[in-house]
Swiss-Prot record:
It is found in: Plastid, Chloroplast. It comes from Chlorokybus atmophyticus. Residues 39-109 form the KH type-2 domain. One of its GO terms (biological process) is translation. This is Small ribosomal subunit protein uS3c. It holds the Pfam family KH_2. It comes from the Eukaryota. The lineage of its organism: Eukaryota, Viridiplantae, Streptophyta, Chlorokybophyceae, Chlorokybales. The keyword GTP-binding does not apply. Part of the 30S ribosomal subunit. PROSITE patterns: KH_TYPE_2 (PS50823), RIBOSOMAL_S3 (PS00548).
Length: 217
């Protein structure tokens, strides 16, 4: 049963950090959590080609600080910062409240080490009608060249237009899902093809964050 747990939630507080940083009263918690989800969906829709790997949100009083980690910051910033200004204006119009938004753009120097971007690459290839095995092999080659220690990819659905849906997976290197000190990056996305939706899961092993020796006090 251990491998069925979400690999990021399993490691929260150990090798993974929360993606929303704030405290709220119990009565407001649900509303703010839904607002965080809406902000992320809005930004990913607006910046669909910007190579967004992660969106972190912090709240301080009436201010919402959004950090966007992207492989293509130029597409977001635009000329003279006009892109960020337009994003802030759109956010204020979309979420008509008294909160003030602030956006920080963080550049990712090696996008092939991000499971989110690898999954999106596979989805784009599948939507372009590339054979799923070739798309998986190309993704593994990109991640391996970037220096990842292990990667596992699973694609499920009507593969290559087959009548019966199935799942196929491939792995390169080590992906120790049961080791808590293992730095596992996980992502899931969907590819919308003419035959239906294909689900794509990517696990990446980036090494161990702690020494393998037990620490005793």
């Amino acid at each position: 049963m251990g491998q069925k747990i979400h690999p990021l939630g399993f490691r929260l507080g150990i090798t993974q950090d929360h993606r929303s940083h704030w405290f709220a009263k119990p009565a407001q918690y649900r509303q703010l959590l839904q607002e965080d989800n809406s902000i992320r969906n809005f930004l990913r829709t607006k910046l669909i080609n910007a190579g967004i790997a992660r969106i972190d949100i912090q709240r301080k009083a009436d201010q919402v600080e959004i950090e966007v980690r992207t492989a293509r910051p130029g597409l977001i910033v635009g000329r003279s910062g006009k892109g960020v200004e337009n994003l802030l204006r759109d956010l204020q119009e979309q979420f008509k409240n008294k909160r003030r938004f602030r956006i920080t753009i963080t550049y990712i120097p090696e996008p092939d080490l991000e499971s989110t971007l690898i999954a999106e690459f596979i989805a784009q290839r599948l939507e372009a009608r590339a054979p799923f095995r070739r798309a998986m092999r190309q993704a593994i080659q990109r991640a391996t060249r970037a220096g990842v220690e292990g990667i596992k990819i699973q694609v499920a659905g009507r593969l290559n237009g087959a009548e019966i849906a199935r799942s196929e997976w491939v792995r390169e290197g080590r992906v120790p899902l049961q080791t808590l000190r293992a730095n596992i990056d996980y992502s899931y996305c969907q590819a919308k093809t003419i035959y239906g939706i294909l689900g794509i899961k990517v696990w990446m092993f980036k090494g161990e964050k702690f020494s393998s020796k037990a620490v005793t006090t």
